[in-house]
Regions:
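A generic structural signal for tightly packed, nonpolar segments enriched in small/aliphatic residues
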Residues: 1-120
Length: 120
């Protein structure tokens, strides 16, 4: 989301997860690979942004606040009992200027996560 660019700039991807161990593994893999990630909260209070009178779920909040967290709250409605994480790469996946191109991120982070063999 563009909201993660506002929150973190272009130096780190945002991470939200329903499992702290998974979030920690992602953040550690980011540090190890140089493809940093920073955890943002995903509290029960954030779930209210998915309520709407027009549909079963809203996929966007009603204002400017917590946009990246609202995206994770929406995704959480489809995860049931799984451990999951949302890595918001809008800030890190592309160059802003002068070159408009992909950076390849979060490939280093995800590669480190998979190669670390800590996933269970």
């Amino acid at each position: 989301t563009g909201a993660v660019v506002i929150a973190l700039g272009r130096h780190a991807s945002g991470v939200m997860a329903n499992d702290q161990h998974l979030a920690d593994m992602i953040i550690d893999a980011g540090e190890e690979s140089g493809d940093r990630a920073w955890q943002l909260p995903l509290w029960d209070e954030h779930q209210s942004c998915t309520k709407t009178r027009y549909a079963d779920l809203a996929n966007i909040g009603g204002g400017r606040e917590a946009g990246t967290i609202h995206a994770a709250a929406f995704l959480s409605k489809f995860t049931n009992d799984y451990k999951w994480a949302h890595i918001d790469i809008a800030a890190t996946a592309s160059h802003s200027s002068p070159v408009k191109a992909g950076t390849g991120r979060p490939v280093p982070l995800l590669s480190e996560l998979l190669l670390s063999k800590k996933l269970k």
